[in-house]
Amino acid sequence: EDHWSFRRSNYFAHIGNEVRNVTENAGLLDMSAFAKARISGPGAEAFLDHLVANKLPKKVGRVALCHALTERGGVHSEFTIQRESATSFYLVSAGAGQRLDHDWIKKHMPDDGRVRLDNLTNSIGVLVLAGPKARDILAKITRADLSNAAFPWLSGQMIDVNLAPAMAIRVNFVGELGWELHHPIEYQNHIFDALMAAGAEFGLKPFGIRAMDAMRLEKSYRLVGTELSIEYAALESGLHRFVHLNKGDFKGQRQLAEWQERGFANAMVTLEVHDTTDADAIGGNPIMTEDGTVIGRATSGGYGFRLGK
């Protein structure tokens, strides 16, 4: 039972144990709550290319992190997009934002039938296997080649996991070697049990969302609704790698370019806080100078167990 506090509570040590095991061995996280959809049809590529600021993946199986901007140039939604074929794309986004994200897609879809949206959230489960021993564990129960050469970062392949089908995507939100295993939900118990059995000798243990959040903070990975917001320009939020102003027309492009010309008032940075004892920033905290002047706000916060600060 959680004991809520503005200081480090009774779950602090358990989060640390989970982070250390993921970092030293491997961990397994259930992220089936992800919002999942398929965008398909003869107009799918052109539609998505106009909706997001990043370039779409060109090769089948490849993955890109993409952001849908508002008409002002802020960030409305974030999608992991995998190309399935010339006319089909698999989209993954935050579970808490499913209605927001899918409504945004529907709002901008053409009405000529050339683009179709299928909600796959309830039919597909997701297990995240992460840690330095993730490859050794998965290799025990699949025939797929998991080497870097055959299975590079930001790519996905259909594989068998103890004979169950899964789309293995080499991405995760914790900054360790690993795969997201997207599978028909009816196979989830089978895949979970197979992974736990295969990982027993490697120290595999489940970990939770709080441990994931602690690790993503250390990597400066951003979340929609905290670091990414409609209030701030996408480039204020540090999304330069994912926003291509010269790729061609996309929603919010002109407004973002004009905002950039005027100059940004804010910048997203990662701050290290030293000499803390039993309390950490939790997000939403004001950042003030010694005389009490507010100069910013902490979007997220927490203790970095891998860094020890």
Report the location of each language-model feature.
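Glycine/proline-enriched, intrinsically flexible loops and inter-domain linkers
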Residues: E1-K309
